[in-house]
Amino acid sequence: MKWISAEHYKALLALVLLLLFACQDADFPRPLHSDLLTESADNNLPPEPSSHIVDLESLDQAQLVKKATSNNFMVVTANPHATAAAKKILLQGGTAMDAAIAAQLVLGLVEPQSSGIGGGGFLLYWDAKQKTLKSYDGRETAPLSVDENLFFSPELGKTDKFFAAVLGGKSVGVPGLMKMLELAHQQHGELDWQQLFSPAIQLADQGFAVSERLNTLLRLVPKVKQREAIRQYFFDQQGEPWAIGAQLKNPEYAQTLVKLAEQGGDYLYRSELTQKIIIAVNQDDNAGYLTAKDFTEYQPLERTPVCRHVFNYRLCGMGPPSSGATTVLATLLILEQLAEPILAAGDEPIENNPLLAHYFIEALRLAFADRNTYVADPKFVPVPINQLLATDYLHSRAQLINAQRAMPVVVAGDLESPLSARFTTQGSPELESTTHLSIVDQLGNAVSMTTSIETAFGSRLMVGGFLLNNQLTDFSFSPTKNRFPVPNRVEP
């Protein structure tokens, strides 16, 4: 067999990333433009974020995969303001963890539709000195008083309609982001906690230019105006979204951040802000079930990362309850088996090979079928990660892929798992939302963090200058299917 170079592997991984982005769900309104995301110590941000807005459809493939390098550090976020905040913290001697917190607090201001302190997140941290990888689970939890019938009426035998469930307090889970960031900072931060809040507080007080992305989403996302606080903040007196470039201030968010900087995460979980959130949720027309006990008992968790060797790299990601790493690794491990002859031949540029694209799509379909059947919250159901990523099992899955045609039907594999015997599968609506950031600092420490308030603009409830999540609608609305329990049903 012909020797396969590292460059071939790198090129294939780059192709996979491009395909992952190209295969994003298209059911939700897509913003017309996106911000260029990368900042390094060797490059300065332009004075205005608008100069970083690029129409991705106008770029050719070479521009889309253009490399960005740095000798010092690298920051990738969804908004130039957040990138600038992270850069500032790094230049002050902060770690990647410090920078990630500063960036996230700014993202909650300038891209509030996607993430914020009213939501949750997952975080991976690589400690370069200790050579250790840690993962943190700060996702929202269901209130203690809800049950599996939160979005289901046993009497009528019907589930709530999706947006009827999303809007208002019923969909709000206990926010977890602040507690997770606080825990991670205690273990990996270098700068004082209060120092990390300065960029976001200053920007909230002084104002920021409304981006085309925010303006577009306010126009396109369904039912954004359903709650008064959102109408007052995001829309002008004529009921139109603030124009692109308009200066938007959020003094209420600034004050919330000041208190969080002074009092720590407890300000969100044990204070008057907690009571404001509970009142907003429980007194809404579509009332929820949050209590003070839900907040005081919330704890972020340290999880075990999921790691495998694939394409000459050791790739790691967040384990359950996140399904991301398990699904991506299964996809890549299947693809690795199918791609090896193509890589060894080296006949044409990998990015131009349609067979590789076909193999990737089919591998992804198989991985998602397993994900939807076997991956859930390990607190409630056993997740057979080792079986799902076993070499023999994935070899058998790869054999199902035909080089000439797509599989007509894709089903989950047959694992000897108690989950398959006790539970059935039922998907949840997949809508675009959420944000991700990646940071590597001067010492080689690295953060990979995904945060969310679930769908765009969350529950449409706004308290303290930030939006509350609608995470509970990420659970399956129906607790059973064909008389078998659904593993992703609502449970406290």
PLM feature segments, named:
Residues 1-12:
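Bacterial N-terminal signal peptides that target proteins for export
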Residues 20-22:
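C-terminal motif of bacterial Sec signal peptides marking the signal peptidase cleavage site
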Residues 24-27:
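Bacterial signal peptide processing site
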Residues 29-84, 88, 96-264, 268-270, ...:
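Noncatalytic scaffold domains of N-terminal-nucleophile
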Residues 52-53, 340-452:
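Internal maturation/activation junctions in enzymes
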Residues 109-116, 120-126, 130-135, 288-291, ...:
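Active-site rim segments in enzyme catalytic domains, especially the processed small/beta chain
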Residues 287-311, 398-428, 469-492:
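Active-site Gly/Thr loop motif
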Residues 316-325, 434-438, 448-460:
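Glycine-rich phosphate/pyrophosphate-binding beta-alpha loops
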